[in-house]
Amino acid sequence: ADAAGIVRPGIIIRTKEYAFVTSPVAATVRYAGPLSDYGMVSILEPSEGILFIFAGLNKVFGEPGQILPEASLVGLMGGENINIENFTTEKELNSGRLSQSLYIEVRRNDEPQNPFDWFEFNKEE
């Protein structure tokens, strides 16, 4: 369940403030913007019938129909006071705080899939 107690078919991972969220593979942007109670969302289609949904972003990048190469920036996580001074200070960049929540959902032909079958997650030390 998420912070509101809603059970969703994806997973929630903790990220650092201001973390970049990138496309794991080349994909077409299907949507980038606000989506009901998911906040700012980026929906990518790496192949026909497959959707990667990234939600909980502070800012999204890309336009619907845009084809993104692998590792392209699709979003930016939020933080307490997002501004260029905080973003670039060594203290902020090296704080290691995992205070943001990124929701990841995978769908195949509109059926939820287990994200762990699609992504490799490494715990940062």
Residue ranges of predicted features:
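Short glycine/threonine/proline-enriched tight-turn/helix- or strand-capping micro-motif at secondary-structure
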Residues: 1-23, 92, 101
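Short, glycine-/polar-rich solvent-exposed loops and beta-turns at beta-strand/coil boundaries
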Residues: 4-6, 35-37, 96-98
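Short, acidic/hydrophobic/Gly-rich beta-strand patch recurrent on exposed beta strands
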Residues: 11-14, 41-46, 105
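Short alpha-helix capping/helix-loop boundary micro-motifs
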Residues: 14-15, 54, 58-62
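Surface-exposed strand-loop junctions at beta-sheet edges and helix termini
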Residues: 24, 62-63, 67-68
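Short, conserved catalytic or interaction motifs in soluble domains
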Residues: 34, 59-62, 79-82
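Conserved, short, structured surface segments that act as functional micro-motifs
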Residues: 66-125
